[in-house]
């Protein structure tokens, strides 16, 4: 293909040099507009039609959908444009300067996962786009690291229906067919303050939280006993108590206590059912102490995800890679993209480097990643399969 694009390393360098941090702290949250425009300029050069959509209820966040070819089916290659914030005191390299050392590329987003777009664009150099028989779509989303607002909006609004989708998260090029979901809640209890010398004149919120945690532990045991999927290394839903705070003085009856907890459900356990179980577990406390206990979401919940391993598209990927699809315990945008078409998670780099100081991707992934992307495009967009 005779196109004017920077070399692979320069593509990578420009992606890393374009900050796109997403964070719940608005003082460090950044728009991804510059990165979206950068991708759009490259993809236009190749011949893609570009659609850029603002993501509702966000500050300066955009999705990009690039389309090459027309008709039904085809392939959707997906990635998120944002990164997590970086720990300034722990990085030994500039997070926004691509640094090559010891056969590794260092920088914020090298593995998770802005670099995936460089791999896609580089693979397209060898593709004769005039021979595309089914469409190739490239989706770049916003805010995966916080609310997954970009993927949620795309799934709810798009009209495209590809045959298959790949999300290029860092899986060490192992195909991922399922992962757990994530539900995070704040349990808040309002007591009644008073002097600690006379406990009966107050209601100690810490005591009530202690009872509530007992009910939650019973639910945790129930989840472990009744829900099981041996495909996962941790084959049951997990519950974690991650933060607790209550009281303001040793000689005062605690008037307020707050617990932050999360549950990671298996695929098949719906968020609606899980919320029902959570409310049912705490109902005795609500009945005993009316109006004193509330349950609030900390983040928008993410459902579990599973692409059936007997799906013909999964078989294609497994044969191309020579390995079976696996499961993981972390979350991706797959539950939302799966609403559009069958989806696998597959990309270069290791999840062990995600969200870490001196994030890197090993350069040994360059050749194999370019090869598998080319094979996927050939199978889903060029051949008569």
UniProtKB/Swiss-Prot annotation:
Its main location: cytoplasm. Its cofactor is Zn(2+); Co(2+); glutathione. Its EC number is 3.5.1.16. Zn(2+) 1 binds at residues 80, 112, 169. The active site is at 82, 144 (proton acceptor). Zn(2+) 2 binds at residues 112, 145, 355. GO terms for cellular component: cytoplasm. It catalyses: N(2)-acetyl-L-ornithine + H2O = L-ornithine + acetate. GO terms for molecular function: acetylornithine deacetylase activity; zinc ion binding. It comes from the Bacteria. NCBIfam families: AcOrn-deacetyl, PRK05111.1. Homodimer. Catalyzes the hydrolysis of the amide bond of N(2)-acetylated L-amino acids. Cleaves the acetyl group from N-acetyl-L-ornithine to form L-ornithine, an intermediate in L-arginine biosynthesis pathway, and a branchpoint in the synthesis of polyamines. Belongs to the peptidase M20A family. ArgE subfamily. This is Acetylornithine deacetylase. It comes from Photorhabdus laumondii subsp. laumondii (strain DSM 15139 / CIP 105565 / TT01). The gene is argE.
């Amino acid at each position: 293909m005779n196109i004017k694009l920077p070399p692979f390393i320069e593509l990578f360098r420009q992606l890393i040099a374009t900050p796109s941090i997403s964070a719940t702290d608005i003082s460090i949250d950044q728009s991804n507009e510059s990165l979206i425009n950068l991708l759009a300029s490259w993809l236009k050069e190749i011949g893609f039609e570009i659609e850029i959509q603002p993501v509702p209820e966000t500050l300066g966040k955009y999705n990009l959908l690039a389309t090459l070819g027309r008709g039904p089916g085809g392939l959707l290659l997906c990635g998120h444009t944002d990164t997590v914030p970086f720990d300034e005191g722990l990085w030994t390299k500039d997070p926004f300067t691509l640094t090559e050392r010891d056969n590794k590329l260092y920088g914020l987003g090298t593995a998770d996962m802005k670099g995936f777009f460089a791999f896609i664009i580089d693979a397209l150099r060898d593709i004769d786009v005039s021979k595309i028989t089914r469409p190739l779509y490239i989706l770049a989303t916003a805010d995966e690291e916080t609310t997954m607002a970009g993927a949620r909006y795309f799934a709810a609004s798009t009209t495209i229906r590809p045959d298959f989708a790949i999300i290029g998260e860092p899986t060490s090029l192992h195909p991922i067919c399922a992962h757990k979901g994530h539900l995070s809640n704040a349990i808040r209890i309002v007591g009644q303050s008073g002097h600690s010398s006379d406990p009966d004149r107050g209601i100690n919120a810490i005591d009530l939280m202690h009872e509530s945690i007992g009910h939650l532990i019973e639910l945790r045991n129930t989840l472990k006993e009744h829900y099981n999927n041996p495909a996962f290394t941790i084959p049951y839903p997990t519950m974690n108590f991650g933060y607790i705070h209550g009281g303001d003085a040793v000689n005062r009856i605690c008037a307020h206590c707050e617990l932050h907890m999360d549950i990671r459900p298996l695929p098949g356990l719906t968020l609606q059912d899980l919320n029902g179980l959570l409310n049912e577990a705490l109902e005795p406390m609500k009945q005993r102490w009316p109006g004193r206990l509330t349950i609030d979401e900390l983040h928008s919940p993410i459902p579990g995800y599973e692409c059936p391993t007997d799906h013909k598209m999964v078989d294609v990927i497994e044969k191309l890679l020579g390995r079976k699809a696996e499961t993981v315990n972390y979350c991706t945008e797959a539950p939302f993209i799966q609403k559009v078409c069958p989806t696998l998670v597959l990309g270069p780099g290791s999840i062990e480097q995600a969200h870490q100081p001196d994030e890197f991707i090993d350069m040994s992934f360059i050749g194999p990643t370019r090869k598998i992307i080319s094979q996927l495009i050939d199978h889903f967009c060029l051949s008569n399969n």
